[in-house]
UniProtKB/Swiss-Prot annotation:
It comes from Homo sapiens. Residues 705-761 are cytoplasmic. It is linked to Retinitis pigmentosa 35: A retinal dystrophy belonging to the group of pigmentary retinopathies. Retinitis pigmentosa is characterized by retinal pigment deposits visible on fundus examination and primary loss of rod photoreceptor cells followed by secondary loss of cone photoreceptors. Patients typically have night vision blindness and loss of midperipheral visual field. As their condition progresses, they lose their far peripheral visual field and eventually central vision as well. Cone-rod dystrophy 10: An inherited retinal dystrophy characterized by retinal pigment deposits visible on fundus examination, predominantly in the macular region, and initial loss of cone photoreceptors followed by rod degeneration. This leads to decreased visual acuity and sensitivity in the central visual field, followed by loss of peripheral vision. Severe loss of vision occurs earlier than in retinitis pigmentosa, due to cone photoreceptors degenerating at a higher rate than rod photoreceptors. It is found in: Cell membrane. This is Semaphorin-4A. Residues 573-631 form the Ig-like C2-type domain.
């Protein structure tokens, strides 16, 4: 075909050829994958202006690990390294520092810490590990105090912190860990502190302890090995008569070829006073059971990271939600799960059978002997008999497991902390909302509606560089989640409704805090559940039902008119880039040209954008469509006009607002680029290098055959190669012999350059 028939000059034809080659090299854009489990529908990277966050930090302070919300929800108390802060969080935006009191470890304790081979730069400080509200006028706090735990009371005055008096500092052994790296937990119940931590400098003696209050101080018996020496505590949750401790430790009841971690729940009674003769100053009601969080066909999630209690509307059905990971990696990545445990199931297991250790076989088996009344380990009133206490010393492990319900399973991520709440939707139902911190500094918002599995509404990357989320504190009255980490505290509004610009996008988000307001045509924060005109569908995320005034087909495409059309004036023989914002990671995207698909010969899709060679007949309406949950809707619409030929706007699009925009435009003829917002020079270099390699390969092949023939002639015309015997060093007995001549022509040489029918002279 002649060049004029294509309507292109030679340079434009070369540009078209390179564009087609570029189309083959560019990766195909697909809707995200990213491992097993639900994907976050919207991702916000650090510094994304679409997600407004507030950051508090204080010069000279770090390790903002401990968070406590005041009773009125207006003040956030923060335990940092060697300081305690009071932050006013009533107003939106950055929390305001009300006041701060220092509580450093003494110089003597720091010297002793360094003498014991601990680091002066990272360890020999006072890391605040316990911060609880003792009453309306005092807080109670404990810290590592340079590997010498200490505790004290802090007086409050109008929610301001008063300075700590050194003479009121008490020993904190058993309440705070020695090592800031060790996990711990503590909860204040009826004026008594229940704590789980390490009780020695080496970190080899875990302990569950009760201090403060009028009841006697009680603790676990380390000699009886109720806890494995590597027990790691993550949560303490009070109930009506008991306090539950959640932790993980090495399992001793299983025969396994490697050290097997297991998650546990332990229980002690609030009215426990210890034994009179046996188990003096020790728990007499300590029991523990295995927690099981697993999904069929997968390895168990056997390492618990955090647990919280969500009281239900009915006091008979509260649940505990816990975050788990696995000690094993699958495919080089770790996985996480959130499981729900009914308190009724936990109580039932603790009322079941015991395990006992067979001393002859060293195996744990089910105890089948008689039971006494009252039942050993029960929260009965009055002292226990010596027989019951003797039984409790060896029968502290329950036979049955507490099986949880997996709500969220996700690979490629490790969750560290969890905060939960319920949100009432427009349908009047309560939906579980979970906020999950990760080891890489992300915050996930997950929602569970009814019996359906969890879906991830959003993922927020909090830090430019990955680091773990250390603590989460939900402030319902402020509508925010506070995130503690090494450098400060983030304030994260729990919903970001304004990012959803259409009714379809708002409904598909399935965020119980957001609903579409038809009057203002905005996605708004749901302030009251009785807004009948607002639109929301939490169960199905069905925009067909929520966003249409009348009956609609399954696809929204025929009835979807763009809210605005962006007009683009293009130059002939140029590459035009039409961007398409990917509003949802769950959607698949495609382009249309009017009622038809875009022409494949002159276009390609790269990173969601449409790259289009402007030629005759390519003008008109271009729309980027998203398909999600079975529904298609336009994300963005362009009307492309050429400088040489202006098209009349489709009458069906009359009345739609239009906006003239400039998009990346690159000329493929001999001229320079017209709009160099995005350079395709790297792609051009790639294509050029590949073309040069192909050309070089062809030249090598063409030159190789003559060279081979020349080499064969030179070998035949020269001397015969030495025989193996002639290659050995000459001895005295050997005599030099002249080489024998090959009398043959080049045609008498085989493929290996051997003489054929050679006559030897």
């Amino acid at each position: 075909m002649a060049l004029p028939a294509l309507g292109l000059d030679p340079w434009s034809l070369l540009g078209l050829f390179l564009f087609q080659l570029l189309q083959l090299l560019l990766p195909t854009t697909t809707a995200g994958g990213g491992g097993q489990g639900p994907m976050p529908r919207v991702r916000y990277y650090a510094g994304d202006e679409r997600r407004a966050l507030s950051f508090f930090h204080q010069k000279g302070l770090q390790d903002f690990d401990t968070l406590l919300l005041s009773g009125d929800g207006n003040t956030l108390y923060v335990g940092a390294r060697e300081a305690i802060l009071a932050l006013d969080i009533q107003d939106p935006g950055v929390p305001r520092l009300k006041n701060m009191i220092p509580w450093p470890a003494s110089d003597r304790k720091k010297s002793e810490c360094a003498f014991k081979k601990k680091s002066n730069e990272t360890q020999c400080f006072n890391f605040i590990r316990v911060l609880v509200s003792y009453n309306v006028t005092h807080l109670y706090t404990c810290g590592t105090f340079a590997f010498s735990p200490a505790c004290t009371f802090i007086e409050l005055q109008d929610s301001y912190l008063l300075p700590i008096s050194e003479d009121k500092v008490m020993e904190g052994k058993g309440q705070s860990p020695f090592d800031p790296a060790h996990k711990h937990t503590a909860v204040l119940v009826d004026g008594m502190l229940y704590s789980g931590t390490m009780n020695n400098f080496l970190g080899s003696e875990p302990i569950l302890m009760r201090t403060l209050g009028s009841q006697p101080v009680l603790k676990t018996d380390n000699f009886l090995r109720w806890l494995h020496h590597d027990a790691s505590f993550v949560a303490a949750i009070p109930s009506t008569q008991v306090v539950y401790f959640f932790f993980e430790e090495t399992a001793s009841e299983f025969d396994f070829f490697e050290r097997l971690h297991t998650s546990r729940v332990a229980r002690v009674c609030k009215n426990d006073v210890g034994g009179e003769k046996l188990l003096q100053k020790k728990w007499t009601t300590f029991l523990k059971a295995q927690l099981l969080c697993t999904q069929p066909g997968q390895l168990p999630f056997n390492v618990i990271r955090h647990a919280v209690l969500l009281p239900a509307d009915s006091p008979t059905a509260p649940h505990i939600y816990a975050v788990f990971t696995s000690q094993w990696q699958v495919g080089g990545t770790r996985s996480s799960a959130v499981c729900a445990f009914s308190l009724l199931d936990i109580e039932r297991v603790f009322k079941g059978k015991y395990k006992e250790l067979n001393k002859e076989t060293s195996r744990w088996t089910t105890y089948r002997g008689p039971e006494t009344n009252p039942r050993p380990g029960s929260c009965s009133v009055g002292p226990s008999s010596d027989k019951a206490l003797t039984f409790m010393k060896d029968h502290f492990l329950m036979d049955e497991q507490v099986v949880g319900t997996p709500l969220l399973v996700k690979s490629g991520v490790e969750y560290t902390r969890l905060a939960v709440e319920t949100a009432q939707g427009l349908d009047g139902h309560s939906h579980l909302v979970m906020y999950l911190g990760t080891t890489t500094g992300s915050l996930h918002k997950a929602v569970v509606s009814g019996d359906s599995s969890a879906h991830l509404v959003e993922e927020i990357q909090l830090f430019p560089d990955p680091e773990p989320v250390r603590n989460l504190q939900l402030a319902p009255t402020q509508g925010a989640v506070f995130v503690g980490f090494s450098g400060g505290v983030w304030r994260v509004p729990r919903a970001n409704c304004s990012v959803y610009e259409s009714c379809v996008d708002c409904v598909l988000a399935r965020d119980p805090h957001c609903a579409w307001d038809p009057e203002s045509r905005t996605c708004c924060l749901l302030s009251a559940p009785n807004l009948n005109s607002w639109k929301q569908d939490m169960e199905r995320g069905n925009p067909e039902w929520a966003c249409a005034s009348g009956p609609m087909s399954r696809s929204l495409r025929p009835q979807s008119r763009p809210q605005i059309i962006k007009e683009v004036l293009a130059v002939p023989n140029s590459i035009l880039e039409l961007p398409c914002p990917h509003l949802s990671a769950l959607a698949s995207y495609y382009w249309s040209h009017g009622p038809a698909a875009v022409p494949e010969a002159s276009s390609t899709v790269y990173n969601g954008s449409l790259l289009l060679i402007v030629q005759d007949g390519v003008g008109g309406l271009y729309q980027c469509w998203a398909t999600e949950n079975g529904f298609s809707y336009p994300v963005i619409s362009y009307w492309v006009d050429s400088q040489d030929q202006t098209l009349a706007l489709d009458p069906e699009l009359a009345g739609i607002p239009r906006e003239h925009v400039k998009v990346p435009l690159t000329r493929v003829s001999g001229g320079a680029a017209l709009a160099a917002q995005q350079s395709y020079w790297p792609h051009f270099v790639t294509v050029t290098v590949l073309f040069a390699l192909v050309l070089s390969g062809a030249l090598i092949i063409l030159v190789a055959s003559p060279l081979r023939a020349l080499r064969a002639r030179g070998k035949v015309q020269g001397c015969e190669t030495l025989r193996p015997g002639e290659k050995a060093p000459l001895s005295r007995e050997q005599h030099l012999q002249s080489p024998k001549e090959c009398r043959t022509s080049a045609s008498d040489v085989d493929a290996d350059n051997n003489c054929l029918g050679t006559e030897v002279a």
